[in-house]
Structure formats: C-alpha cells, structure tokens
C-alpha cells in the first residue's frame, strides 16, 4: 500500500491514513 504524503500528527498507527504508521517523531509516515 501507499502512505499519502500528508503531515499528520499521531499517537498510534490508527491515527494515520491508509498504509501509514505512526513514526517515533510523532508524525505519520
């Protein structure tokens, strides 16, 4: 899958879109 290149803050993977995961810096990627 593809993670949309949108800067989104997160606390967990489910806060992110599609195939994105929550990275350590607190943003989806």
From Swiss-Prot:
UniProt keyword annotations, A-Z: Disulfide bond, Knottin, Protease inhibitor, Secreted, Serine protease inhibitor
Intrachain disulfide bonds: 3-20, 10-22, 16-28
Subcellular location: Secreted
Site (described: Reactive bond): 5-6
Main location: secreted
Species, as recorded: Momordica repens
GO molecular function, one term: serine-type endopeptidase inhibitor activity
Domain notes: The presence of a 'disulfide through disulfide knot' structurally defines this protein as a knottin.
Similarity comment: Belongs to the protease inhibitor I7 (squash-type serine protease inhibitor) family.
GO CC, any one term: extracellular region
InterPro entries: Prot_inh_squash (IPR000737), Proteinase_amylase_inhib_sf (IPR011052)
UniProt name for this protein: Trypsin inhibitor 1
Functional note: Inhibits trypsin.
Organism ancestry: Eukaryota, Viridiplantae, Streptophyta, Embryophyta, Tracheophyta
């Amino acid at each position: 899958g593809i993670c949309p290149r949108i800067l989104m803050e997160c606390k967990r993977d489910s806060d992110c879109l599609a195939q994105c995961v929550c990275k350590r810096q607190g943003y989806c990627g």
